[in-house]
Amino acid sequence: MTIDINKRSGGSTELPVAECIDGHMSTWRVRTDFQPVLDEQEKQTGVSFIEKEYPYKPSMQEVKDFVYGVINMQTDEKILTGFVWNNKPVWLSEENQKNFSEAQRVAQMTDGASLPVKFKLGEDENGNPIYHTFTTLNAITQFYTSAVAYINQCLNDGWEEKDNFDFTPYEMILTPVTNNE
């Protein structure tokens, strides 16, 4: 499933989490990650959200897959771009994570003889590269353990968000009501 978490839609605060958008009950939109839209005076003027359109009425499993997919992608984005070490933004791509891990492991195995090692950590707000040279085993170990702790916290936050997500509003709209008289 491809979802662009950076492509948000907007609307009124009264928008439902799911709705049929045609009279034939054949096209549905499901929404998640509602965020307030504020004006210059910090007054809420609407909401933004991520939505997916289905050419049919989606099942609850499809809704859960969509919502969990959004949470997973937001968690990945937070890991990738949210880590700051010593006031320096650090790009935690999978490749960089492997490189940092390997450099720390080799430095540990060689008791620091493999140092110094220089890494491009990320970029500043103007797009200029930010480099750091690790010269001691203690410094690279502190950096690496901080990065691992950050990644673990992001993953735990994502799991907690999924565990606590309330699907009741979706179920009320998408689950047929049965009359057991």
Describe each model-derived feature in a short phrase.
Residues 2-181:
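A preference for well-ordered globular domain cores
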